[in-house]
Protein backbone atom coordinates (compact mmCIF):
# COMPACT_ATOMS: atom_id res chain seq x y z
CA UNK A 1 0.00 0.00 0.00
CA UNK A 2 1.43 3.38 -1.01
CA UNK A 3 1.78 6.09 1.60
CA UNK A 4 0.57 9.53 0.59
CA UNK A 5 2.00 12.65 2.19
CA UNK A 6 -0.68 14.68 3.95
CA UNK A 7 -1.08 18.21 2.59
CA UNK A 8 0.63 20.90 4.66
CA UNK A 9 -1.93 22.76 6.76
CA UNK A 10 0.38 25.68 7.53
CA UNK A 11 3.76 26.44 5.98
CA UNK A 12 6.39 27.08 8.65
CA UNK A 13 9.92 28.45 8.64
CA UNK A 14 11.18 24.86 8.82
CA UNK A 15 9.30 24.02 5.61
CA UNK A 16 10.83 27.01 3.83
CA UNK A 17 14.36 26.36 5.07
CA UNK A 18 14.08 22.75 3.90
CA UNK A 19 13.54 24.04 0.36
CA UNK A 20 17.08 25.51 0.26
CA UNK A 21 18.84 24.08 -2.81
CA UNK A 22 15.84 21.78 -3.37
CA UNK A 23 12.78 23.69 -4.53
CA UNK A 24 12.15 27.34 -5.34
CA UNK A 25 10.11 29.36 -2.85
CA UNK A 26 7.13 31.17 -4.38
CA UNK A 27 6.24 34.47 -2.72
CA UNK A 28 3.90 37.34 -3.49
CA UNK A 29 2.53 40.41 -1.73
CA UNK A 30 -1.07 40.79 -0.57
CA UNK A 31 -2.88 43.47 1.39
CA UNK A 32 -6.44 42.18 1.83
CA UNK A 33 -8.41 39.01 2.51
CA UNK A 34 -9.84 38.68 -1.00
CA UNK A 35 -6.54 38.44 -2.84
CA UNK A 36 -4.90 36.52 0.02
CA UNK A 37 -7.59 33.86 -0.35
CA UNK A 38 -7.00 33.68 -4.11
CA UNK A 39 -3.24 33.34 -3.64
CA UNK A 40 -3.49 30.89 -0.71
CA UNK A 41 -3.21 27.53 -2.54
CA UNK A 42 -0.62 28.78 -5.04
CA UNK A 43 2.22 30.33 -3.02
CA UNK A 44 4.52 29.49 -0.11
CA UNK A 45 4.87 33.00 1.27
CA UNK A 46 2.68 36.09 1.41
CA UNK A 47 4.34 39.38 2.32
CA UNK A 48 2.16 42.12 3.72
CA UNK A 49 4.60 44.68 2.42
CA UNK A 50 4.88 48.34 3.23
CA UNK A 51 4.75 48.59 -0.56
CA UNK A 52 1.00 48.86 0.07
CA UNK A 53 1.68 52.52 0.79
CA UNK A 54 2.49 52.92 -2.91
CA UNK A 55 0.35 50.33 -4.67
CA UNK A 56 -2.69 50.53 -2.36
CA UNK A 57 -2.57 54.14 -1.12
CA UNK A 58 -0.91 55.72 -4.18
CA UNK A 59 1.91 57.37 -2.23
CA UNK A 60 5.33 58.12 -3.75
CA UNK A 61 7.26 55.84 -1.39
CA UNK A 62 6.81 53.49 1.57
CA UNK A 63 7.91 55.91 4.28
CA UNK A 64 4.52 57.08 5.55
CA UNK A 65 3.25 53.55 6.18
CA UNK A 66 2.39 53.15 9.87
CA UNK A 67 2.34 50.29 12.35
CA UNK A 68 -1.45 50.58 12.57
CA UNK A 69 -1.70 50.33 8.79
CA UNK A 70 0.45 47.20 8.72
CA UNK A 71 -1.50 45.58 11.54
CA UNK A 72 -4.83 46.32 9.84
CA UNK A 73 -3.78 44.82 6.52
CA UNK A 74 -2.02 41.86 8.13
CA UNK A 75 -5.22 40.95 9.95
CA UNK A 76 -7.06 41.06 6.63
CA UNK A 77 -4.49 38.87 4.87
CA UNK A 78 -4.46 36.35 7.72
CA UNK A 79 -8.25 36.12 7.49
CA UNK A 80 -7.98 35.16 3.83
CA UNK A 81 -4.86 32.98 3.70
CA UNK A 82 -4.48 30.01 6.04
CA UNK A 83 -1.64 27.98 4.51
CA UNK A 84 1.15 30.36 3.41
CA UNK A 85 3.90 31.70 5.66
CA UNK A 86 2.82 35.30 6.26
CA UNK A 87 5.42 38.02 6.75
CA UNK A 88 4.62 41.55 7.93
CA UNK A 89 6.88 44.45 7.02
CA UNK A 90 8.03 46.62 9.91
CA UNK A 91 7.41 50.13 8.55
CA UNK A 92 9.86 53.02 8.59
CA UNK A 93 10.59 54.22 12.13
CA UNK A 94 9.02 51.20 13.83
CA UNK A 95 12.36 49.58 14.73
CA UNK A 96 14.56 52.61 15.31
CA UNK A 97 15.80 51.12 18.60
CA UNK A 98 15.47 47.80 20.42
CA UNK A 99 12.68 48.93 22.76
CA UNK A 100 10.55 50.30 19.92
CA UNK A 101 11.22 47.30 17.69
CA UNK A 102 10.35 44.79 20.39
CA UNK A 103 7.15 46.64 21.27
CA UNK A 104 5.97 46.73 17.65
CA UNK A 105 7.05 43.17 16.79
CA UNK A 106 5.18 41.85 19.82
CA UNK A 107 2.10 43.77 18.69
CA UNK A 108 2.31 42.04 15.30
CA UNK A 109 2.40 38.63 17.01
CA UNK A 110 -0.31 39.43 19.57
CA UNK A 111 -2.75 41.18 17.24
CA UNK A 112 -2.35 39.13 14.04
CA UNK A 113 -1.56 35.60 12.92
CA UNK A 114 1.59 36.66 11.06
CA UNK A 115 4.41 34.12 10.96
CA UNK A 116 7.28 36.63 10.91
CA UNK A 117 8.29 40.26 10.65
CA UNK A 118 10.66 41.75 8.08
CA UNK A 119 13.07 44.62 8.57
CA UNK A 120 15.51 46.38 6.27
CA UNK A 121 19.21 46.79 7.00
CA UNK A 122 22.54 44.99 7.07
CA UNK A 123 25.04 44.08 9.77
CA UNK A 124 24.12 47.17 11.78
CA UNK A 125 20.79 45.43 12.50
CA UNK A 126 22.41 42.19 13.78
CA UNK A 127 22.10 43.07 17.48
CA UNK A 128 18.45 44.03 16.98
CA UNK A 129 17.77 40.74 15.19
CA UNK A 130 19.27 38.81 18.12
CA UNK A 131 17.09 40.72 20.58
CA UNK A 132 13.93 39.94 18.60
CA UNK A 133 14.74 36.27 18.03
CA UNK A 134 15.59 35.85 21.72
CA UNK A 135 12.01 36.89 22.43
CA UNK A 136 10.62 34.31 19.99
CA UNK A 137 10.07 36.57 16.98
CA UNK A 138 10.94 35.17 13.56
CA UNK A 139 12.83 37.84 11.64
CA UNK A 140 13.23 38.07 7.87
CA UNK A 141 16.11 40.24 6.69
CA UNK A 142 16.18 42.57 3.68
CA UNK A 143 19.34 43.91 2.05
CA UNK A 144 20.32 45.53 -1.23
CA UNK A 145 17.92 48.12 -2.56
CA UNK A 146 16.01 49.10 0.56
CA UNK A 147 12.90 51.24 -0.12
CA UNK A 148 12.97 52.76 3.38
CA UNK A 149 16.37 54.28 2.53
CA UNK A 150 15.24 55.76 -0.79
CA UNK A 151 15.68 59.38 0.27
CA UNK A 152 19.09 58.73 1.77
CA UNK A 153 20.18 56.88 -1.38
CA UNK A 154 18.74 59.53 -3.69
CA UNK A 155 16.43 57.10 -5.46
CA UNK A 156 15.96 53.41 -6.15
CA UNK A 157 19.47 52.29 -7.06
CA UNK A 158 20.70 48.80 -7.92
CA UNK A 159 23.36 47.51 -5.51
CA UNK A 160 26.41 45.34 -6.09
CA UNK A 161 27.81 47.07 -9.14
CA UNK A 162 31.26 47.56 -7.62
CA UNK A 163 33.60 45.56 -5.40
CA UNK A 164 32.97 47.70 -2.32
CA UNK A 165 29.20 47.21 -2.52
CA UNK A 166 29.60 43.49 -3.19
CA UNK A 167 31.82 43.06 -0.14
CA UNK A 168 29.34 44.93 2.07
CA UNK A 169 26.38 42.92 0.80
CA UNK A 170 28.11 39.63 1.56
CA UNK A 171 29.16 40.86 5.01
CA UNK A 172 25.59 42.00 5.69
CA UNK A 173 24.15 38.63 4.64
CA UNK A 174 26.57 36.62 6.77
CA UNK A 175 26.08 38.89 9.78
CA UNK A 176 22.29 38.70 9.58
CA UNK A 177 22.40 34.92 9.19
CA UNK A 178 24.60 34.63 12.29
CA UNK A 179 22.23 36.95 14.18
CA UNK A 180 19.33 34.61 13.47
CA UNK A 181 17.26 35.79 10.51
CA UNK A 182 15.22 32.93 9.09
CA UNK A 183 15.04 34.16 5.49
CA UNK A 184 16.80 36.91 3.59
CA UNK A 185 15.23 39.13 0.92
CA UNK A 186 17.67 40.34 -1.74
CA UNK A 187 16.27 43.33 -3.62
CA UNK A 188 17.82 45.09 -6.58
CA UNK A 189 21.14 43.27 -6.37
CA UNK A 190 23.30 42.37 -9.37
CA UNK A 191 23.00 38.70 -10.31
CA UNK A 192 26.59 37.57 -9.55
CA UNK A 193 26.61 38.81 -5.95
CA UNK A 194 23.05 37.56 -5.34
CA UNK A 195 24.21 34.15 -6.54
CA UNK A 196 27.28 34.29 -4.29
CA UNK A 197 25.24 35.25 -1.23
CA UNK A 198 22.76 32.46 -1.94
CA UNK A 199 25.61 29.95 -2.13
CA UNK A 200 27.41 31.25 0.98
CA UNK A 201 24.56 31.36 3.47
CA UNK A 202 22.57 28.40 4.77
CA UNK A 203 19.21 30.15 4.98
CA UNK A 204 17.01 30.70 1.90
CA UNK A 205 17.24 33.90 -0.12
CA UNK A 206 14.17 35.41 -1.76
CA UNK A 207 14.95 37.67 -4.67
CA UNK A 208 13.21 40.62 -6.22
CA UNK A 209 15.13 42.11 -9.10
CA UNK A 210 18.17 40.04 -8.10
CA UNK A 211 18.40 37.38 -10.79
CA UNK A 212 17.24 33.78 -11.00
CA UNK A 213 19.75 32.15 -8.66
CA UNK A 214 18.01 33.09 -5.40
CA UNK A 215 16.20 30.33 -3.50
CA UNK A 216 12.87 31.99 -4.23
CA UNK A 217 11.25 34.97 -5.93
CA UNK A 218 8.74 37.60 -4.88
CA UNK A 219 6.79 40.20 -6.84
CA UNK A 220 4.23 42.83 -5.91
CA UNK A 221 0.94 41.32 -7.05
CA UNK A 222 -0.35 44.45 -8.77
CA UNK A 223 2.87 44.68 -10.80
CA UNK A 224 2.84 41.09 -12.05
CA UNK A 225 -0.89 41.17 -12.78
CA UNK A 226 -0.64 44.32 -14.88
CA UNK A 227 -2.47 46.91 -12.82
CA UNK A 228 0.01 49.73 -13.40
CA UNK A 229 1.03 51.08 -16.79
CA UNK A 230 2.71 54.32 -15.69
CA UNK A 231 5.92 52.61 -14.60
CA UNK A 232 7.19 49.04 -14.74
CA UNK A 233 10.57 48.05 -13.27
CA UNK A 234 12.87 46.02 -15.51
CA UNK A 235 12.57 42.95 -13.27
CA UNK A 236 8.76 42.76 -13.42
CA UNK A 237 7.13 40.27 -15.75
CA UNK A 238 3.42 40.89 -16.40
CA UNK A 239 1.39 37.69 -16.42
CA UNK A 240 -1.94 39.44 -16.96
CA UNK A 241 -3.28 42.73 -18.31
CA UNK A 242 -5.34 43.18 -15.17
CA UNK A 243 -6.14 46.87 -15.52
CA UNK A 244 -7.31 46.42 -19.10
CA UNK A 245 -9.44 43.36 -18.27
CA UNK A 246 -11.17 45.09 -15.36
CA UNK A 247 -11.78 48.31 -17.28
CA UNK A 248 -13.32 46.31 -20.15
CA UNK A 249 -15.63 44.54 -17.70
CA UNK A 250 -16.71 47.85 -16.13
CA UNK A 251 -17.33 49.31 -19.60
CA UNK A 252 -19.59 46.35 -20.45
CA UNK A 253 -21.43 46.78 -17.15
CA UNK A 254 -21.89 50.53 -17.75
CA UNK A 255 -23.06 49.88 -21.31
CA UNK A 256 -25.64 47.34 -20.12
CA UNK A 257 -26.96 49.76 -17.49
CA UNK A 258 -27.23 52.63 -19.98
CA UNK A 259 -29.08 50.47 -22.51
CA UNK A 260 -31.43 49.02 -19.90
CA UNK A 261 -30.01 45.51 -20.33
CA UNK A 262 -29.06 45.15 -16.67
CA UNK A 263 -30.68 43.83 -14.65
CA UNK A 264 -32.77 41.48 -16.78
CA UNK A 265 -35.78 39.39 -15.69
CA UNK A 266 -33.63 36.54 -14.34
CA UNK A 267 -31.68 39.02 -12.22
CA UNK A 268 -34.82 40.63 -10.75
CA UNK A 269 -37.23 39.65 -7.96
CA UNK A 270 -40.99 39.34 -8.44
Swiss-Prot record:
Its name, as the record gives it, is 3-methyl-2-oxobutanoate hydroxymethyltransferase
Q: CDD domains this protein is in?
A: KPHMT-like
Q: Species name for this entry? A: Helicobacter pylori (strain ATCC 700392 / 26695)
- Where do transmembrane segments lie in this chain? none
Question: Entry's HAMAP family?
Answer: PanB
Q: What family name appears in the similarity comment?
A: Belongs to the PanB family.
Q: Which reaction does it catalyse?
A: 3-methyl-2-oxobutanoate + (6R)-5,10-methylene-5,6,7,8-tetrahydrofolate + H2O = 2-dehydropantoate + (6S)-5,6,7,8-tetrahydrofolate
This protein's assembly is summarised as: Homodecamer; pentamer of dimers.
Q: What does this protein do?
A: Catalyzes the reversible reaction in which hydroxymethyl group from 5,10-methylenetetrahydrofolate is transferred onto alpha-ketoisovalerate to form ketopantoate.
Amino acid sequence: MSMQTAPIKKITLNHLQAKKNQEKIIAITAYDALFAQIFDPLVDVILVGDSLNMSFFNQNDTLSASVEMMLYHTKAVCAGAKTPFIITDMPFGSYKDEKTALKNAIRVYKETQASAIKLEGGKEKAKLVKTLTNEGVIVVGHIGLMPQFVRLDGGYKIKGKNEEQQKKLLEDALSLEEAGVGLLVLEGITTPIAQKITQKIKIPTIGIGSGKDCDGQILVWSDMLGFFDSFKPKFVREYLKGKELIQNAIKQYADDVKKGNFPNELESYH
